[in-house]
Amino acid sequence: MSEGKLIKRSVFFISDGTAITAETLGHSLLAQFPNVDFDIHIMPYITTEEAAMNIVEEINQCQSRDGTLPLVFDTLVDPNVREIINTSKAVNLDVFEGLISKLEQVLGTPPTTLVGQTHAVTDSEYYKARIDAVHFALDNDDGALTRHYDKADIILIGVSRSGKTPTSIYLSLQFGIRVANYPLTEEDLDDNRLPKVLKEHKNKLFGLMIDAERLVAIRTERKANSRYASYSQCQMELRAVEGIFISEGIPYLNVSEMSIEEISTRILQMTGLKRRIG
């Protein structure tokens, strides 16, 4: 392999449910190997032997094309379906099998075999909390409805394109937390103080910081060669917003090198917010 060239490898996330569990765990593990270019295939709701055989054919085609064994992460409950998947020309990484058998030994009770149970709507209160939180995050994105801030669990603030929206959505979807977010504009920063609507909810504020170089790269994707994406503008905004965070005593986090999952976990740790689900 020539220097700087990425290794290519096909990856399959297979589930009899949404595949969210297999995908989440798989991505967390694959992130440890940045020198590999992963070709991701997501296969949810594989509940029949026929569907499994079709997947095996696709996996084998990838193996033949790539010349390497694909990686297969699965959360399949049905042993017959799983057995078919295991006949593929791949490295099969059953997410549940080893863990379930260990838990069965420790707990002294057999597991259920309900297909797709991981993300099923088995608890209506949890489901409602998740949906309500996601609706809240969408309705209160980017300073849209500040009159609802009294109902927020947390209000994320920071400059434009600092990661507020994806973090809000993840916190709401994964933990059922009601998150609003508000962009601190150049006008806000010129005044060097919090907008009145934020001061009224200061105890709910949490700041997101980002390195200037990273912010330039993100903004350039949106508005290349603009003042908005220039290094001087980004640096000015970030210095001003960090000054506000410090002077107002607002907790904040530099998210430049963090994934959304890491950002969300750190926010929970730093604020002591209690998750409603998960």
Swiss-Prot record:
Family, per entry: Belongs to the pyruvate, phosphate/water dikinase regulatory protein family. PSRP subfamily.
EC code: 2.7.11.33, 2.7.4.28
Binding sites annotated in the UniProt record for ADP: G158, V159, S160, R161, S162, G163, K164, T165
Biological role: Bifunctional serine/threonine kinase and phosphorylase involved in the regulation of the phosphoenolpyruvate synthase (PEPS) by catalyzing its phosphorylation/dephosphorylation.
A GO molecular-function annotation: ATP binding
Protein name (record): Putative phosphoenolpyruvate synthase regulatory protein
UniProt xrefs under PANTHER family: PYRUVATE, PHOSPHATE DIKINASE REGULATORY PROTEIN 1, CHLOROPLASTIC
InterPro entries, per database record: Kinase-pyrophosphorylase, PSRP
Reactions accelerated catalytically: [pyruvate, water dikinase] + ADP = [pyruvate, water dikinase]-phosphate + AMP + H(+); [pyruvate, water dikinase]-phosphate + phosphate + H(+) = [pyruvate, water dikinase] + diphosphate
Keyword Nucleotide-binding among UniProt keywords: yes
NCBIfam families on file: PRK05339.1 (NF003742)
Keyword entries, A-Z: Kinase, Nucleotide-binding, Serine/threonine-protein kinase, Transferase
